[in-house]
Amino acid sequence: MSAAVACVDYFAADVLMAISSGAVVHRGRPGPEGAGPAAGLDVRAARREAASPGTPGPPPPPPAASGPGPGAAAAPHLLAASILADLRGGPGAAPGGASPASSSSAASSPSSGRAPGAAPSAAAKSHRCPFPDCAKAYYKSSHLKSHLRTHTGERPFACDWQGCDKKFARSDELARHHRTHTGEKRFSCPLCSKRFTRSDHLAKHARRHPGFHPDLLRRPGARSTSPSDSLPCSLAGSPAPSPAPSPAPAGL
């Protein structure tokens, strides 16, 4: 019995190796324990040998056909092919099921909810003024905070110059005011020798020159590049003369 089972195992292994390598093998291997050559032995011959007299166990079922049919020789090959397909995980492993490639491609391309090629939405002004009848909105919360002071009247930036109690809502306004105490004139006219404490005063003065051109004020040194100095001037008419420098505090 063990010799017959071993012979069937060797035959199945031969078929698997033949299918995987693409060759056709028509001979069998000798069985172990001196079983002798097994050339031309098929599955039915092995079953008849296993059911020889004197072997305990139920008799084997009768064959389906008296003679070898056209598909009898191909039956072991089909069985081996199905086993090999199961081992390889091919399409025969799960008939009727979706292949792993199709399922993975379907899972890797979910609907994004946006039309292909659509550009992302631009940044919106999400910081809106909460005061009624004010529809202003800003990109940054710091800009909104500065705007809210126009409603509340808050002026947290106070001048620390001795004898000056002025306060401002913005730090750049305080810096510009501080130059009125120090007498600093950072903005020089590119067409003459005059200097000014504010960039808008320089612009008004420079326009009076016959050869004035706006590009002259964009040169380095002609006007400051600080954004705080680009605010519109609240004074009308010709620029007022700069005040004389105040005496420095006694503690300095």
Swiss-Prot record:
Q: Which family does it belong to?
A: Belongs to the Sp1 C2H2-type zinc-finger protein family.
Enumerate composition-biased segments (Low complexity): 96-124, 230-239
Alphabetized, the UniProt keywords read:
DNA-binding, Metal-binding, Nucleus, Phosphoprotein, Repeat, Transcription, Transcription regulation, Zinc, Zinc-finger
What's this protein's name?
Krueppel-like factor 16
Q: Which residues carry this modification: Phosphothreonine?
A: T152
> Which portions of the chain have biased composition (kind: Pro residues)?
55-65, 240-252
Tell me where it mainly resides.
nucleus
Look up the record and give one Gene Ontology term from the biological process aspect.
Answer: regulation of transcription by RNA polymerase II
Where is the protein localized?
Answer: Nucleus
Q: Which InterPro entries match?
A: Znf_C2H2_sf, Znf_C2H2_type
Residues bearing Phosphoserine are: S99
Does the record bear DNA-binding in its keywords? yes
Q: Where is this region: Disordered?
A: 25-74, 90-128, 204-252
What is the taxonomic lineage of the source species? Eukaryota, Metazoa, Chordata, Craniata, Vertebrata
Q: Name one GO cellular component term.
A: nucleus
Could you tell me one molecular function GO term of this UniProt entry?
zinc ion binding
* SMART domains (alphabetical): ZnF_C2H2
**Function comment:** Transcription factor that binds GC and GT boxes and displaces Sp1 and Sp3 from these sequences. Modulates dopaminergic transmission in the brain.
